[in-house]
């Protein structure tokens, strides 16, 4: 069996609403180009926690915790065309969304 060409698009963001909007715009662009698509598949959210002292001098027991959540989505595009790649490169995504494209 011959392996088909596919492009894997991974999206990262701290804001899940912006991430879903970006994934939806990519899906619409791929469907407009009549290519097959798998996704968006939600990947596990990475949570990074930071613990800091509330006071700079005393009260070691008084601490505060902060967390950063990194949400991820995965989109597979099967058998992409050059026209599809051009439309994906011209696609305007909101600030705060990181896009990683691999073949």
Curated annotation (Swiss-Prot):
Keywords: Ribonucleoprotein, Ribosomal protein. One of its GO terms (molecular function) is structural constituent of ribosome. GO terms for biological process: translation. GO terms for cellular component: ribonucleoprotein complex; ribosome. InterPro entries: Ribosomal_uS10, Ribosomal_uS10_dom, Ribosomal_uS10_dom_sf. PANTHER family: 30S RIBOSOMAL PROTEIN S10 FAMILY MEMBER. Part of the 30S ribosomal subunit. Involved in the binding of tRNA to the ribosomes. HAMAP family: Ribosomal_uS10. This is Small ribosomal subunit protein uS10. The gene is rpsJ.
